[in-house]
């Protein structure tokens, strides 16, 4: 930046010096032939000065041409960079300032050249070689008109310059009247030569500084190109990674859909197994209920039989006790009768001894009594025999009842074993149901985990897509900035074209001067340089068009990428909706299965409660019947 400021100050000094020279040279000049040789020498010196100024202008144009690819590189760098926009803006602003200063210097050099051309016109008009100069002027004017026509087609500023040129011609005619002597002009020209040599030295230093700056800018352009290549590779890698991620995501979706189908098929199989197990459990439960009912009936019968046996045993005991008591009473009576007989016998013997007739009567009476007693004893013996027969029959019935009890016990044991088997089968069924429920819970948990994983993956993919959106928006912003910078570059190119056209005008003026001085070779070189400049301008226009095409292609690529991004986002949203719908369907199925299981369990519990109530009722009825049976034998 400091070098650019110094260069601008040098150019301003040169411009002021040229103005002072022009003011001094406007003095009247003499038209003597003796000073023509001096004038020729001055013209040659001015020719060398013009060549030096032309070289300086070429250097300035070369520096401008070198700056333009730097701007292009910076534009390309901006297209592919993701960060350091502030640094790039600073670089661009610095380069803009440098270009503006160089353009100012270029304009000042142009004005100095125009001033020198005017001065030469003044000198040449002061010569007596008017005929030759007029011919040359006519030729030059014809050429100038042709060139001006071309320039008028391109821009309208050259018309103003032509008007200024005509006004300056009028001023030269006026200035010729007031020209001074050639000696004073020669001295002043020598002073100017010395000053211009010093200025040339300064300009050489300035050119060296520009060369160093150009080298730095070339290094920066290379670095920027390398960074752009790195950014391109990174963007390509990102695109490849996004493509791979999309492929992996599609594969995961396919795998997830297959897993969902497998899970649904497994759930259906488990539902079929559950229905089979439930039907089997219902059959086992019905069989178990029948066995329980039969068991309860058998238990009731056993209890009734036991009660009947107990009652019969009690009756037998009562009968035995009654028979024992009756036998004891009979024995007592027999003993009492025997004792009475003995006593009677003793009394009879005594009475026989006393009263023999009465003894016979008493004997008859005793015999009758004994006969009565014997009849009573025989009747009681018959009753005892009948009781013994009843006891035997009761014992037979007891043995039969015991056999029946044994059979019933064996049946009860069989039923108990069957009940145990049924209980074991029911426990197995319960364990299976619990296992199935546990498996269903595990499946639901795994489903939920898979769903959470898929949600996390979807969220990560959505975050990546948001990042891609941010990168696309950043790229669009950069495109907008690049377009703005392109417009600025176009404006600068237009300014440079204007300056180059002005230089062409100056070159045309120099060509006129050189034709006046018969310097055709230099004119050819200048024409070649002008053609080169025109070619360079055309190249610049072509490069600008290429840049515009690149920008258009980039915009199309961005639009295409935006469309792809929208399509992918729509696909991802559709897939997410499908996943959510599948998850909701799975949850609904699981909830329906749970509701079915709960309804079945509630129905089973209700059936069990109903069976328990029925068993209680039957037990109560059996108890009532037993009570009635017990009350019936007690009533007689």
UniProtKB/Swiss-Prot annotation:
The keyword Cytoplasm applies. Residues 36-97, 141-220, 249-325, 377-484, 519-631 form a coiled coil. One of its GO terms (biological process) is cell projection organization. InterPro entries: Odf2-rel (IPR026099). Mainly expressed in trachea and testis. Not detected in bone marrow, bladder, leukocytes. Only weakly detected in tongue, stomach, brain and ovaries. Keywords: Cell projection, Cilium biogenesis/degradation, Coiled coil, Cytoplasm, Cytoskeleton. Belongs to the ODF2 family. Acts as a suppressor of ciliogenesis, specifically, the initiation of ciliogenesis. This is Protein BCAP.
């Amino acid at each position: 930046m400091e070098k650019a400021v110094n260069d601008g100050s040098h150019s301003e000094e040169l411009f002021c010096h040229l103005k002072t020279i022009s003011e001094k040279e406007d003095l009247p000049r003499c038209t003597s032939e003796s000073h023509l040789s001096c004038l020729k020498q001055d013209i040659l010196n001015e020719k060398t000065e013009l060549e030096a100024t032309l070289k300086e202008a070429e250097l300035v144009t070369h520096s401008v041409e070198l700056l333009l690819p730097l701007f292009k590189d910076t534009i390309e760098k901006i297209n592919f960079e993701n960060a350091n926009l502030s640094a790039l803006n600073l670089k661009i602003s610095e380069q803009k300032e440098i270009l503006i200063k160089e353009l100012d210097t270029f304009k000042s050099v142009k004005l100095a050249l125009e001033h020198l051309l005017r001065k030469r016109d003044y000198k040449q008009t002061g010569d007596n070689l008017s005929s030759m100069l007029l011919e040359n002027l006519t030729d030059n004017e014809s050429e100038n008109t042709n060139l001006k026509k071309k320039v008028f087609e391109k821009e309208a500023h050259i018309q103003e310059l032509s008007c200024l040129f005509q006004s300056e011609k009028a001023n030269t005619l006026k200035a010729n009247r007031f020209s001074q002597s050639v000696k004073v002009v020669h001295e002043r020209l020598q002073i100017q030569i010395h000053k211009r040599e010093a200025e040339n030295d300064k300009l050489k230093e300035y050119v060296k500084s520009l060369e160093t700056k150009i080298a730095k800018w070339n290094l920066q352009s290379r670095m920027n190109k390398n960074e752009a290549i790195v950014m391109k590779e990174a963007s390509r890698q990102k695109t490849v990674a996004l493509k791979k991620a999309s492929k992996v995501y599609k594969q995961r979706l396919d795998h997830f859909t297959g897993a969902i189908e497998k899970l649904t098929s497994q759930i259906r199989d488990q539902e079929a197994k559950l229905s089979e197990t439930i039907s089997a459990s219902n059959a086992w439960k019905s069989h178990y209920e029948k066995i329980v009912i039969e068991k309860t009936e058998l238990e009731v019968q056993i209890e009734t039989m036991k009660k009947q046996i107990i009652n019969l045993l009690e009756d037998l005991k009562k009968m035995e006790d009654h028979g024992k008591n009756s036998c004891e009473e009979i024995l007592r009576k027999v003993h009492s009768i025997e004792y009475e007989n003995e006593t009677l016998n003793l009394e009879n013997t005594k009475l026989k001894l006393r009263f023999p007739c009465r003894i016979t009567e008493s004997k008859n009476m005793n015999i009758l009594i004994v006969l009565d007693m014997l009849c009573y004893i025989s009747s009681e013996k018959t009753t005892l025999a009948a009781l013994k027969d009843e006891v035997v029959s009761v014992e037979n019935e007891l043995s039969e009842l015991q056999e029946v009890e044994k059979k019933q016990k064996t049946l009860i044991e069989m039923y108990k074993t069957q009940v145990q088997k049924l209980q074991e089968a029911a426990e197995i069924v319960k364990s299976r149901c619990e296992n199935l429920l546990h498996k269903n819970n595990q499946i639901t948990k795994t489903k939920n985990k898979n769903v959470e994983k898929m949600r996390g993956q979807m969220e990560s993919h959505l975050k990546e897509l948001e990042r891609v959106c941010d990168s696309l928006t950043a790229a669009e912003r950069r495109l907008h900035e690049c377009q703005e910078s392109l417009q600025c570059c176009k404006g600068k190119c237009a300014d440079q074209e204007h300056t180059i056209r002005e230089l062409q005008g100056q070159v045309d003026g120099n060509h006129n001067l050189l034709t006046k001085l018969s310097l055709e070779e230099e004119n050819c070189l200048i024409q070649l340089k002008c053609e080169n400049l025109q070619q360079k301008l055309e190249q610049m226009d072509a490069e600008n068009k290429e840049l515009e095409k690149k920008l258009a292609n980039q915009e199309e690529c961005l639009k295409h990428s935006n469309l792809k991004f929208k399509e992918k986002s729509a696909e991802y949203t559709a897939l997410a909706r499908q996943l959510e719908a599948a998850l909701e369907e799975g949850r609904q199925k699981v909830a329906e299965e749970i509701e079915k299981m709960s309804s079945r369990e509630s129905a089973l519990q209700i059936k069990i409660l109903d069976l328990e109530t029925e068993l209680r009722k039957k037990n109560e009825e059996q108890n009532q019947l037993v009570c009635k049976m017990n009350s019936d034998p007690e009533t007689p």
